[in-house]
């Protein structure tokens, strides 16, 4: 190779930026994939809206095992329970999307959303197919408050839970306002008294116009 060819090769390679290798080879945490692969396990992600957010569907009996894995694995231990809620899918058809094919006819479906600081990813788990789910408060302290709101609004119950009193409604209240069968219009309503700091379940009076 001549001197001019060597100089030209060095000049051309000097302007090329070397691509950085991705910090994590797999997009979805492989520890979770191998752990739940024998279950009815499915996950989705969107590279258009938010590429670091995954949605997973698991049977309800996997809730306690899920928390133990999230708290014990090296790259999953640095995680935070961001949100916990529920959805009443009673009467929901499969035409709403592929995700609901796994969730339909399950009544109330729980949803737990975690953020993993080391992986920089957010994963939302839907737990379906059961009325009772093991509590996550032994692994995440804020699960105590969030699960109490779910059980109060959606008539759910958590196993191994230390505190199950109502937060938003009066103690001893047996109605669940967020269920689809709750008569939200026409017959009854929940009224909050700001002076007495109490809530009341009262019958609505029909008015003719």
Curated annotation (Swiss-Prot):
Any matching Pfam family: Complex1_30kDa
InterPro entries, A to Z: NADH_quin_OxRdtase_su_C/D-like, NADH_UbQ_OxRdtase_30kDa_su, NADH_UbQ_OxRdtase_CS
Enzyme class: translocase
Localization of this protein: Mitochondrion inner membrane
Top-level taxon in the UniProt lineage: Eukaryota
Primary location recorded for the protein, binned into one broad class: mitochondrion
GO cellular component: mitochondrial inner membrane
Gene3D superfamilies assigned: NADH:ubiquinone oxidoreductase, 30kDa subunit (3.30.460.80)
Record keywords: Electron transport, Membrane, Mitochondrion, Mitochondrion inner membrane, NAD, Oxidoreductase, Respiratory chain, Translocase, Transport, Ubiquinone
Gene Ontology molecular function: NADH dehydrogenase (ubiquinone) activity
EC number(s) per entry: 7.1.1.2
Catalytic reaction equation(s): a ubiquinone + NADH + 5 H(+)(in) = a ubiquinol + NAD(+) + 4 H(+)(out)
Entry's family note: Belongs to the complex I 30 kDa subunit family.
Assembly and interaction partners: Complex I is composed of about 30 different subunits.
Protein name: NADH-ubiquinone oxidoreductase subunit 9
Organism: Paramecium tetraurelia
Gene behind this protein: NAD9
């Amino acid at each position: 190779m001549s001197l001019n060819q060597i100089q030209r090769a060095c000049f051309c390679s000097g302007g090329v930026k070397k691509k950085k290798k991705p910090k994590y080879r797999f997009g979805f945490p492989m520890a979770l994939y191998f752990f739940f692969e024998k279950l009815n396990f499915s996950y989705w992600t969107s590279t258009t809206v938010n590429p670091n957010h995954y949605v997973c569907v698991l049977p309800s009996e996997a809730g306690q095992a899920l928390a133990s894995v999230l708290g014990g694995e090296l790259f999953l231990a640095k995680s935070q329970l961001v949100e916990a809620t529920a959805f009443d899918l009673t009467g929901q058809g499969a035409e709403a999307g592929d995700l609901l094919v796994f969730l339909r006819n399950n009544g109330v479906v729980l949803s737990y959303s975690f953020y993993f600081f080391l992986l920089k990813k957010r994963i939302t788990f839907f737990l379906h197919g059961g009325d009772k789910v093991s509590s996550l408060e032994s692994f995440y302290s804020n699960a105590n408050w969030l699960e109490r709101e779910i059980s109060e609004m959606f008539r759910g119950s958590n196993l191994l839970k230390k505190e199950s009193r109502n937060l938003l409604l009066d103690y001893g209240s047996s109605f669940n306002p967020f269920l689809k069968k709750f008569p939200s219009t026409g017959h009854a309503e929940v009224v909050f008294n700001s002076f007495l700091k109490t809530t009341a379940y009262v019958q609505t009076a029909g008015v003719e116009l």
